[in-house]
Design a protein with these regions (language model features):
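Active-site acidic catalytic loop and adjacent metal/ATP-binding pocket
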Residues: 1-5, 139-185
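Short, surface-exposed acidic
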Residues: 42, 209-216
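Residue-level preference for long, well-ordered alpha-helices that form the structural scaffold
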Residues: 19-22, 66-69, 101, 105, ...
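Active-site catalytic-loop/activation-segment of kinase and kinase-like phosphoryl-transfer enzymes
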Residues: 92-143
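Short amphipathic alpha-helical signal-transduction/dimerization elements
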Residues: 78-85, 130-135, 195
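Active-site activation/catalytic loop segments of kinase-like enzymes and analogous catalytic loops
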Residues: 28, 183-210, 221-249
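ATP-binding pocket architecture of kinase catalytic cores
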Residues: 2-95
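Short helix/strand-bridging catalytic loops that position acidic/His residues to coordinate divalent metals
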Residues: 60-64, 174, 188-191
Length: 252
């Protein structure tokens, strides 16, 4: 049976992967959490930290379709969040907390927004929200703490990190951002990164109670703007990001 081997070198000191211990966290996820998480993830055959970095030997899901139906994804995420509500941070105290490395994200956003703001393809609502977030990213990150009980979250629940089997089963991959924060954080990022605004209400309804979504959307917008900065102005990818960010701004 073919395997997928994922190797990560030692992160550069002072970078976000270094500050968050992202690569080590994924190793620990597969060692400690994956067997009991309650969601489908790739089977893990090896999860080690070495002198050179980390190595994972995982089930090969290359035959599965990239992405997932967002309604199904919302249902799967909600089930995991309910399962581990108020339990995850006690069972795995090493999980990343709310506002981890917020100062580094603040600095990165300030540098990026100064360049991104000049793009002509931004909607005025996005420009206004980006301006409002400048110098307040740390505040937005800490606001997440009031969005609900802490639980196990994927941390990067975009469609890029989901796979669908030929018979419709959904798997979550790439657990480098696994955290213990309010579950609505996963919903906010899935919407902002991946879901057509026309389906947001449908997806939110499938997730269930999400009354604090507006509280966490500003932090999701920060990450979305950083992602938008990596696109070419006027490209299809940029326009998709702008559409979703505009919806997030409208709901913030």
């Amino acid at each position: 049976m073919p395997h997928y081997v994922k190797r990560r070198g030692r992160p550069v000191p002072g970078t976000i992967p270094d500050a968050l211990g992202m690569f080590q966290a994924e190793v620990r996820f597969y060692r400690e959490i994956a067997p009991v998480a309650g969601v489908r993830v790739p089977a893990c055959y090896q999860a080690d930290e070495t002198d050179d970095g980390t190595v994972l030997v995982l089930e090969d899901l290359s035959a599965w379709r990239p992405g997932a139906d967002p309604v199904l994804a919302a249902t799967v995420l909600a089930g995991m969040h309910r399962r581990w509500e108020e339990r995850a941070p006690l069972r795995w105290p090493w999980l990343r907390p709310v506002a981890a490395a917020a100062d580094l994200v603040e600095r990165l956003f300030s540098q990026t927004w100064a360049r991104l703001r000049a793009r002509e393809d931004l909607a005025s609502s996005i420009t206004s929200l980006g301006d409002a977030l400048t110098g307040r990213v740390t505040v937005a990150e800490h606001a997440i703490a009031a969005a609900g009980p802490l639980t196990l979250v994927h941390g990067d629940a975009s469609m890029l990190n989901m796979r669908t089997s030929p018979d419709g089963e959904l798997a979550l991959v790439d657990w480098e951002d696994v955290s213990a924060v309010p579950g609505v954080v996963d919903l906010a990022w899935m919407l902002t990164s991946s879901v057509d605004p026309a389906r947001w209400d449908e997806v939110i309804a499938a997730y269930g109670p999400a009354g604090e979504l507006a509280r966490v959307l500003p932090a999701a917008v920060v990450q979305g703007l950083l992602s938008l900065a990596d696109t070419t102005a006027g490209s299809a990818a940029a326009m998709d990001w702008i559409s979703r960010l505009n919806e997030a701004a409208r709901r913030t």
